[in-house]
């Protein structure tokens, strides 16, 4: 049976892909999962510089799932290119790199760096807060969605996946904005914002107060 799919011109052997943030950069799960059986490995988010992530506790169990507020902890693009990409290239699977940033310039720096790397697609995480616009997430403003999509496309060699935030009134508006900016693929969705209160301690269950469900 043919299981291959074409994603923005990239041929995947099957449509099974990992979700960014749940699978590290592949090495962490390679003892438990045969990576070459996957259509693609989608890496944890990588930024232009190392990010330490949020203070602990970062994870809380809730009814029917869990909340997490890792804070996109990552080693930065230099370490990622030197360590993680060579590891993934050992396996016959496509590589999708998730990109995060605090400013448009941060995203573009990572995207430009990846033009010379053997990766297949780039997934742009626009749920990150835009520090130049008061901290509102890029993905919550259609003008910002279109603008950042258009900007990263200027630097990208690989097809661009725009990963949309569900924490908006109308996600179709954001999808149209990404399409207008030149997105090749849309990824729906990033995590839903949630909160858990420890009623015994009368405190938030995670240090960041809110997390992704």
Predicted ranges, named:
Residues 1-95, 101:
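N-terminal capping/small domains of soluble enzymes
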Residues 31, 35, 90, 102-213:
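Alpha/beta enzyme core
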């Amino acid at each position: 049976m043919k299981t291959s799919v074409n994603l923005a011109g990239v041929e995947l052997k099957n449509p099974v892909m990992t979700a960014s943030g749940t699978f590290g950069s592949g090495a962490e799960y390679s003892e438990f999962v045969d990576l070459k059986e996957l259509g693609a490995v989608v890496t944890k988010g990588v930024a232009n510089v190392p990010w330490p992530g949020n203070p602990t506790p970062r994870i809380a169990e809730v009814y029917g799932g869990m909340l997490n507020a890792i804070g996109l902890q990552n080693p930065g693009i230099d370490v990622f290119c030197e360590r993680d990409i060579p590891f993934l290239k050992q396996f016959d699977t496509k590589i999708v790199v998730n990109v995060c940033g605090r400013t448009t310039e941060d995203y573009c720096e990572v995207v430009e760096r990846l033009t010379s790397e053997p990766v297949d697609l780039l997934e742009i995480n626009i749920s990150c807060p835009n520090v130049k616009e008061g901290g509102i997430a890029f993905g919550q403003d259609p003008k910002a969605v279109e603008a950042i999509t258009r900007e990263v496309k200027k630097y990208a060699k690989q097809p661009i996946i725009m990963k949309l935030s569900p924490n908006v009134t109308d996600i179709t508006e954001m999808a149209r904005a990404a399409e207008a900016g030149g997105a090749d693929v849309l990824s729906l969705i990033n995590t839903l914002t949630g909160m858990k209160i420890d009623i015994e301690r009368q405190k938030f269950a995670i240090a960041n107060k809110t997390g992704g469900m």
